Design a protein with these regions (language model features):
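Extended acidic/charged loop-beta regions that coordinate divalent cations
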Residues: 60
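Charged interaction scaffolds used for protein-protein
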Residues: 1-12, 17, 32, 37-50, ...
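A short, sequence-level motif marking secondary-structure junctions
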Residues: 22-28
Length: 108
């Protein structure tokens, strides 16, 4: 079960619940993946609903790696993610929000 105050969420991948966190290392890897793009631009795309499936996948990979699973992007391409693309997008948005909100601003 997730603790919204910890900044962590979980995702069911291939029927296994996986913890996710945007640790400093995971954020650094995400920045490399984004290339010329920025974390600020990624957050803005999620806030406005203008994110892409690539944004969701990059965020999911970073979160899973930050949660301790050494998964690759290519491994997730064929994985069964609970809720499908919409479920993945919802969890990615929760992860992003929890990573950047102060504890007193977080909502369950």
């Amino acid at each position: 079960m997730d603790n919204p105050w910890s900044g962590r969420v979980s995702l069911l991948v291939n029927d296994v619940e996986r913890p996710m966190a945007l640790t400093l290392g995971a954020l650094a890897e995400l920045e490399v993946t984004l290339g010329d793009d920025t974390l600020v631009a990624l957050v803005e795309r999620f806030e406005t609903g203008a994110f892409s499936s690539g944004d969701v996948l990059s965020l999911i990979v970073a979160g899973l790696r930050g949660g301790g699973w050494s998964v690759t992007r290519s491994e997730l391409l064929s994985a069964d993610i609970a809720g499908g693309p919409m479920g993945a997008a919802r969890v990615a948005a929760q992860l992003l929000a929890r990573a950047f909100l102060l504890p007193e601003e977080r909502r369950a």
